[in-house]
Each structure stands twice: as structure tokens, then as C-alpha cells.
Amino acid sequence: SPLVALMDDQVSALKQNNVSAERLHSHMTDAENKEIWNSFCNGNIKILYMSPEALMNQNKINVIKTLGIGLFVIDEAHCISKWGPGFRKDYEALSQLKEIFPNSNISAFTATADKATREDIMEKLTNSNCELVLQGFKRPNLSLSVYQKFNWKDQLLRFLSDRKGQAGIVLSLIHI
């Protein structure tokens, strides 16, 4: 899934820069997830990526309470608002973080929130006691390309070889 690919890519980039980071997700084995969780709980991992569904698990919440987490970072924060609860209800449950962890900071990021959605996110996550930082959406480092498929294996290999050392996500209508 794009979320898992993004988590894997971001963790890989952090590790290449000697940042102690990991991720928990359903594409990993239970043993891998357990090993990573235990390492995080023992203080060996400084940044842990996980889905709202994994974070808002009561057993994990109880453990995290003992760890003194200083910062929660929420990506795709627009899912907390308006249409999010019907799509992924655990995003809306993230609004409980301010009560569960009153001494922790919360940062939320989205690229797709209008003014009303931003205000709703701020209210749900911080009771509007926060700083809003807005930036433009122009990202010269990002690109989107659509290719007609002819010989998809050769096209994919050529595409990847032309971009060695770069990060990216390839979306396909077929399972590769």
C-alpha cells in the first residue's frame, strides 16, 4: 500500500542518516513487529512510525504512558476531520492524545486541508491551543508521471535504473 511504502521509505532514509527509526505495519511478520516494539520500549528506537489503528490500541497506549513520549507526529491529519471518521475511525480517535498524554506535544501535517478542516484538526488535537504554519504546495522535488504500458517489466526496470539512489513510489493497476 502507499502508506506502507511511504513508511518504509522514510525509515530507510532516516537510517541512512544514522537516525534510530523503525516502523510497525501489517506487511511485517508478528515476530518482526514484536521485536521492533520491544526495542522501542527499551529506548533503542527514537522514532517509531505506526498507523493510528496500531497507536490507539489500549495495550500500546498503556505501555506508551510509561515511556514519557515527548512528541506525536500525525501525517495525513485531514483524516481526523470531516470525512476521516467514516473512512478510518482511528484517525478521529487521535483526538484523545491530548487527554491521554497532556505533557506531550502534537504536530499534525496535511497537504489537503482547507481553512475549515484546519480549524477542525486544531480543535480536535489541541483545543485550538496551537501554532498554525502554512506553506505553499509547490514542491519542485516531486513529480508525477503517467506511462502507457507496453512491456511493463522492461519499462519498470528502465524507469528504476534511470533513478538510482532516488526515492519514489510506483503505483500500478496490477500486482507486481
Q: What kind of feature is each model-predicted range?
A:
Residues 1-15, 117:
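Conserved Walker A/P-loop ATP-binding site and its immediately adjacent core
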Residues 85-88, 116-124, 138-163:
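Inter-lobe coupling/hinge segments of SF2-like helicase ATPases
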Residues 18-28, 130-134:
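Conserved RecA-like helicase motor-core motifs
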Residues 70, 78-134:
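Post-DEXD/H (motif II) to motif III coupling segment of the RecA-like Helicase ATP-binding lobe
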